């Protein structure tokens, strides 16, 4: 909208156009112009053709009879608008120039051909548009408030669910802790029971041996005394003495009974499996809850030209037609392999892959060291910096040197990998059956990366999560 220089807002009484003083006790003459009542005598002149007086407006030169009633002008509140050029109150609005006009502005040449109307009439379309916009804004505001209310309700539902899940987690782990504590107490009680049986059988053994030692001691003493007797006395009871001198075979009792030894041996075997059971439980729990250090993706800079990666870098498949890719010291060119990202130099990490084996093809899953060979023929063993399992339709084997055939109950269609850097372990499980596949032990130095390879058309590998 163009500027409106003809408009000013009056913050004090407007000035009279005759005396230039404050327009106090103002009156409006018939032509519509306003002056101070004290200035009216200056407007009076004798009419040329009448005996009466006339009022001559100095602004529009219109003549009126002096007897014509003059309307007092109630001065509006501070802030009324007046024409800056003529000092007159604003009554009109020019649609073409979007300007406020007084009487003189309306009659001037500038706005003769323009669409000019009274303020109340001109403002109505604008008021209608404003009301329409106001209704639209009110509707939009109401809709936003409704959406906000709905979202707040959803948020409250989610918060309630979270609070419920927190309680469930606390309850589950408290129950688990109680069960573990109960099992711990049972194991310790069983160990104490075995310990008491050992001490009991030891006491029984000592008692038997002590009794036999005492009996033999008494017999030795008796025989020593017999040896000191004269021949006549000794020969009197020769048959009795000879009977006493005969050696009786002493069956030495066992300190621990074979039955107790078997119980201890069986319990010892159970205890030996406890750490492995706890480790597997921890891994299964972490995997089930998807507690991991981050998302694993495939590194396109390392991918062989025989591999096609998905846009999200979560899936890779084999292709017979090698892709045209820039050469890089990081890229595998002898094996259809690719590394995962990121690499790890500490901590415990887990990831899972789903396998799709093509006809006569297969997949390799595991980890590889940062310095693994990328160019030309490469081996798959710990000496080559690779700890992985090779899976095909017919068999599965570990990349040891020499390779280790793995007689699994079924060929995995998904593999879960658990890396414990500090412990130097890489453990692989069947993701569907939880059956252990193989555990590598190593002494890592530098970063290790998730390692994957696929071969033959139709073979595909997809990272989960």
Curated annotation (Swiss-Prot):
Residues 126-229 form a coiled coil. A zinc finger (B box-type) spans 78-119. Disulfide bonds: none annotated. Its main location: cytoplasm. CDD domains: Bbox2_TRIM10-like (cd19765), RING-HC_SHPRH-like (cd16569), SPRY_PRY_TRIM15 (cd15826). It catalyses: S-ubiquitinyl-[E2 ubiquitin-conjugating enzyme]-L-cysteine + [acceptor protein]-L-lysine = [E2 ubiquitin-conjugating enzyme]-L-cysteine + N(6)-ubiquitinyl-[acceptor protein]-L-lysine. Gene3D superfamilies: 2.60.120.920, Classic Zinc Finger, Zinc/RING finger domain, C3HC4 (zinc finger). One of its GO terms (molecular function) is molecular sequestering activity. The keyword DNA-binding does not apply. Residues 276-465 form the B30.2/SPRY domain. Belongs to the TRIM/RBCC family. Interacts with paxillin/PXN; this interaction recruits TRIM15 to focal adhesions. Interacts with TRIM8; this interaction prevents TRIM8 cytoplasmic translocation. This is E3 ubiquitin-protein ligase TRIM15. It comes from Homo sapiens (Human).
